[in-house]
Design a protein with these regions (language model features):
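Hydrophobic alpha-helical transmembrane segments of multipass integral membrane proteins
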Residues: 63, 67, 71-83, 87, ...
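Membrane-interfacial helix termini and adjacent extracytoplasmic/periplasmic loops
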Residues: 41-43, 50, 115-144, 176, ...
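N-terminal, non-cleaved signal-anchor transmembrane helix
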Residues: 1-60, 64-67, 71, 258-265
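Membrane-embedded alpha-helices of multi-pass transport/permease systems
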Residues: 26-29, 33, 82-86, 119, ...
């Protein structure tokens, strides 16, 4: 009787899991299939084609948006990683109470609604007389990426042995040399994960970018939004598919990085 109940429970659990996966990924799979459909119809299959991908890469508007997206994602992730790593070191050296308070404040931007962050940054830029454009998107992305870097680096810093750093200093090493030779190798997996996570978050962002971009500049997410409002084109399916696959690859790299595997073993 117990065995029968156990099997029934497993069947229900597996069915529930499959149902969740279908609801989550069926729309994405449908979009990916339509990106290879030669027919513009969303209900009829006209045969396999790559013309929508060719059309996408031939579009100057899409290529400009792609360059903007990659440039903003890379630069913002790089700067956020540098600032976030430095901030993590400073926070880690604090006493327990102020460290807890600062970490709580740091976590607020991650818990805050993107629309609130986007509007707040837009109003701040306007108040300081900064014209909305490429630079404001970059600043906004650096701002919301820093907490994610701190979140990735802090656990690694807590695992480091402070005595080795102090020993290097006692042996005559400068603080910078001691950091890069002793501390950085230990926190490197966390720094790399923070960079990849920041790059992914920047690549995928729409709401904050929408409020801080100004006129005359687009990223892939804002371009897709503006194009969809005029009517869905098959090239948008192709573009969305590429974005999804790019984000998926980055997440896989982040989760299966050599440093993380080593840590788990």
């Amino acid at each position: 009787m117990k065995t029968l109940k156990h099997h029934a429970k497993r069947i229900v659990e597996n069915f529930y899991l499959v149902l969740i996966l279908i609801f989550l990924y069926a729309p994405i799979v449908t979009m990916m299939v339509l990106s290879f459909n030669s027919s513009k119809s969303r209900t009829q299959w006209g045969g396999f084609t790559l013309q929508w991908y060719t059309q996408m890469f031939d579009s100057a508007t899409i290529m400009d948006a792609l360059v903007n997206t990659l440039l903003i994602a890379f630069v913002s992730a790089l700067i956020a990683t540098i600032i976030g790593t430095a901030a993590s070191i400073a926070i880690n050296s604090m006493k327990p109470l102020p460290r807890t308070i600062i970490m709580g404040i740091t976590n607020i931007p991650m818990l805050n609604a993107d629309i609130v962050t986007g509007i707040s940054l837009m109003l701040a830029f306007i108040a300081f007389g900064i014209s909305l454009g490429f630079q404001t998107i970059l600043i906004a992305h650096i701002t919301f990426n820093i907490p994610y870097v701190i979140l990735s680096v802090m656990p690694k810093l807590k695992q480091t042995n402070k005595s080795t750093y102090e020993a290097a200093m006692d042996l005559g090493a400068s603080p910078v040399y001691a950091f890069f030779k002793v501390v950085f190798p230990d926190i490197r997996p966390g720094v790399l994960s923070g960079f990849l996570l920041a790059f992914t978050m920047s690549l995928d962002d729409f709401i904050i970018t929408h409020f801080t971009k100004g006129a005359g500049i687009n990223t892939l997410s804002t371009l897709i939004y503006s194009e969809v409002r005029r009517g869905i084109k098959p090239s948008m399916y192709a573009l969305s598919t590429i974005i999804f696959l790019a984000v998926l690859v980055l997440l896989l790299i982040t989760n299966f990085a050599p440093g993380r595997k080593k840590e788990e073993h």
